[in-house]
């Protein structure tokens, strides 16, 4: 069945196919039946109860338009965004490219979204009863020196409506964003956002975990530095990781020369290395959410065995269809 759907979707360019899928899932979300059952494989992470350890990665539903539709596919949690303080168009099109032979995707979207206020309204309307994370970023026009302002604006606006909040400082498609992963810039950001989290938890009388999303391109030394910052500032979790700038796994393939972040199956080895190195440095002090390149139960389990407590998928679903979510949710064994 999915082979027919995929043939139809792949006859369109990647972004048109994505937008079509979001509209279809919005419609599915309004139907009174589940498309697929919610597999029960419960796990507790960051003080939150997940019905199963498989989540939708950020970037799939940037504006929270199709939460209920995605929820009917069997995800134990859904992360929406990345969202910015005000709406922005992102980078010029075309900006999404399939690497068919490798089951990969390159994107240079640049945080295209309708703004945090629209996302919050969509989250408020959603009926999905799983865990919802909201992924926040900065506007392209905001100087990197003022990035904290954007993250604070978003954190304040989404806090009441999220189960957890992810701080995205690792997209390669927003100028200088990845510099926030290093040294004093990271220290200042984490310190300020942790303070904001504490204030908001008192205001709303509920603690919402704060998660950092990092790049798979960090060196071992840089991973150790990030881990140290996460521990010192008592950040609640880390997503390992975002898309990669490396083209080593897809060299010579059609579209491999396109600029942007590479996701999908080619990212698998790099993201598992990131999880493994991070797990060594963190030594169990905070949980890791594994993301990047998961395309089978074996590749997902590999990330759990490397140190992840939860998993996120997106690109592989485009190539393989909905059965992948069901298989992962049923068969992944969290240690």
Curated annotation (Swiss-Prot):
Biological-process GO terms, alphabetical: 'de novo' pyrimidine nucleobase biosynthetic process; 'de novo' UMP biosynthetic process
Any one GO molecular function term: dihydroorotate dehydrogenase (quinone) activity
InterPro entries found in the cross-reference section: Aldolase_TIM, DHO_dehydrogenase, Dihydroorotate_DH_1_2, Dihydroorotate_DH_2, Dihydroorotate_DH_cat, Dihydroorotate_DH_CS
Swiss-Prot/TrEMBL catalytic activity: (S)-dihydroorotate + a quinone = orotate + a quinol
Keyword hit for Flavoprotein: yes
Cellular localization per UniProt: Cell membrane
Topology with respect to the bilayer: Peripheral membrane protein
Assigned EC number: 1.3.5.2
Alphabetized CDD domains for the sequence: DHOD_2_like
Cofactor mode of binding and number, as noted: Binds 1 FMN per subunit.
Keyword vocabulary terms for this entry: Cell membrane, Flavoprotein, FMN, Membrane, Oxidoreductase, Pyrimidine biosynthesis
Pathway: Pyrimidine metabolism; UMP biosynthesis via de novo pathway; orotate from (S)-dihydroorotate (quinone route): step 1/1
Binding site for FMN: 58-62, 82, 135, 168, 213, 241, 264, 293, 314-315
Cofactor(s) this protein cannot do without: FMN
Domain of life (superkingdom): Bacteria
Binding site for substrate: 62, 107-111, 168, 173, 242-243
Disulfide topology: none
A Gene Ontology term for the protein's cellular component: plasma membrane
Active-site residues per Swiss-Prot or TrEMBL entry: 171 (nucleophile)
Family statement drawn from the similarity comment of this UniProt entry: Belongs to the dihydroorotate dehydrogenase family. Type 2 subfamily.
Subunit structure: Monomer.
Function: Catalyzes the conversion of dihydroorotate to orotate with quinone as electron acceptor.
Official protein name in the record: Dihydroorotate dehydrogenase (quinone)
Organism whose genome encodes this protein: Actinobacillus pleuropneumoniae serotype 7 (strain AP76)
Taxonomic lineage: Bacteria, Pseudomonadati, Pseudomonadota, Gammaproteobacteria, Pasteurellales
Name of the coding gene: pyrD
């Amino acid at each position: 069945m999915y082979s027919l759907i995929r043939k139809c979707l792949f006859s369109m360019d990647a972004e048109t196919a994505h937008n079509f899928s979001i509209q279809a899932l919005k419609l599915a979300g309004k139907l009174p039946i589940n498309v697929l059952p919610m597999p029960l494989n419960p796990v507790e992470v960051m003080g939150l109860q997940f019905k199963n350890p498989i989540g939708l990665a950020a970037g799939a539903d940037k504006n929270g338009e199709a939460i209920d539709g995605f929820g009917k596919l069997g995800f134990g949690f859904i992360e929406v965004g990345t969202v910015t303080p005000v709406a922005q168009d992102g980078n010029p099109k075309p900006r999404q490219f399939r690497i068919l032979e490798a089951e990969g995707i390159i994107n240079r979207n640049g945080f295209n979204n309708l703004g945090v206020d629209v996302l919050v309204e969509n989250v408020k309307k959603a009926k999905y009863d799983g865990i919802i994370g909201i992924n926040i970023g900065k506007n392209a026009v905001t100087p990197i020196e003022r990035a904290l302002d954007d993250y604070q604006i978003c954190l304040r606006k989404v806090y009441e409506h999220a189960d957890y909040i992810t701080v995205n400082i690792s997209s390669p498609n927003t100028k200088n964003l990845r510099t926030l992963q290093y040294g004093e810039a990271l220290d200042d950001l984490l310190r300020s956002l942790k303070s904001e989290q504490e204030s908001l938890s008192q205001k709303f009388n509920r603690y919402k975990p704060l998660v950092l999303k990092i790049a798979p391109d960090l060196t071992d030394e840089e991973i150790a530095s990030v881990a140290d910052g996460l521990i010192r500032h008592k950040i609640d979790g880390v997503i390992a990781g975002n898309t990669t700038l490396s083209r080593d796994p897809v060299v010579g393939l059609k579209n491999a020369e396109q600029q942007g972040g590479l996701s999908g199956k080619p990212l698998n080895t790099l993201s598992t290395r990131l999880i493994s190195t991070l797990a060594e440095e963190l030594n169990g002090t905070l949980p890791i959410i594994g993301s990047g390149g998961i395309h089978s139960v074996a590749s997902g389990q590999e990330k759990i065995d490397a140190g992840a407590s939860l998993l996120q998928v997106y690109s592989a679903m485009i190539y393989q269809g909905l059965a992948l979510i069901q298989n992962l949710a049923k068969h992944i064994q969290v240690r």
